[in-house]
Amino acid sequence: MNKICLLLCCLLPGLFRAGAQELKMTEYAPLTQIYGEVCESDELLPMGDVGVEFGYVLYQAAITVPAGEAALELENVRDYAAVYLDGVFQGALTDNRKTLTLKAEPGRHTLQLYVENIGRITYGPEILDNSKGLFGEARLGGETIAGWTITPLEVRDTDPETLEFEALGPCNTPCFRRGQFDRAAHEGAVYLDVSGWGMGEVWINGHYLGSFWDEEKQQSILIPAEILA
C-alpha cells in the first residue's frame, strides 16, 4: 500500500474528498507558524505597503458589535476576503460584494480578514490603480474601524517539512491540514477533486501543486505521476 501525503492550506471551510476515495485529514498546523513581520496601522493598508505583492495577508482589529444587526462595510477589497469573528467564519467579500452583516452578541470581538490577491489587472481603467488587499474606509454600523494589525502570510513560500503538526481537532479558522490517501487505489491519471473545498493551496508529498477556489470553473487538479512514486 502506497500512502501519499496531502497538505492543504485552507482559507475557507470545506468538505474534503478525492474522487471515490475519502481523504483522511488527520493533522493540522496553525497559520501563526508562517506569520511575516506584523505592521500596526490606524487605517487599512494595501498589500504593497507591507511588502506583499502576491499571496495572502491577515487584517485584524478589535471591534465593538452593537445590539442588533451590524453591517461590516469595506471600501476596497482586492480581491477576496474571508471574514471571521472570534475565529468563526462569517462570510466572504469581494470588490463586487463589500458589505456583510456580522452575527455576534453585543460587545468586544476580534475581527479577522484573510485576504488573497488573485491576480493583477492588465487592461482597462483599473490598471492605473492596481493596489491589492484592503484599503480605504472600513466601517461597522457606520462607525470607522481603526487600530489594525496587518500580517503577511507566507503560504506559498512555506517548506512543508518545517511545519509542526498536531492531531486535528475542531479547527474553524484557516490552517494547514495534512492527511493521506492510497495511491494503489487509483490506476492511470490521478486527479484531486477540490469541489466544495472553499479556497486554499495544495501540496502532495512536499510538492506544491497550486491553488483552488470553489468559484472557479476548474474543480480538479492533476497530480503528476512522478510525485506519486
Regions found by a protein language model. Name each.
Residues E116-A146:
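Glycine/proline-rich low-complexity spacer/linker segments in large multi-domain proteins
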Residues E69-Y84, L111, F181-N205, F212-W213:
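Aromatic-lined ligand-binding clefts that engage carbohydrates, nucleic acids, or primary amines
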Residues L100-R108, D182-R183, S220-A229:
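Short, surface-exposed tryptophan/glycine-enriched loops
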Residues G19-L128, P160-L163:
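Carbohydrate-binding surfaces of carbohydrate-active enzymes
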Residues I4-P13:
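Sec-dependent N-terminal signal peptides
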Residues G141-D182:
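Compositionally biased low-complexity segments at domain edges in trafficked proteins
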Residues Y59-A61, K98-L100, R177-G179, K217-I221:
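Short strand-edge motifs at loop-to-beta-strand transitions and within beta-strands
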Residues Q90-G91, I145, L209-G210:
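Short, isolated positions in well-ordered beta-strands
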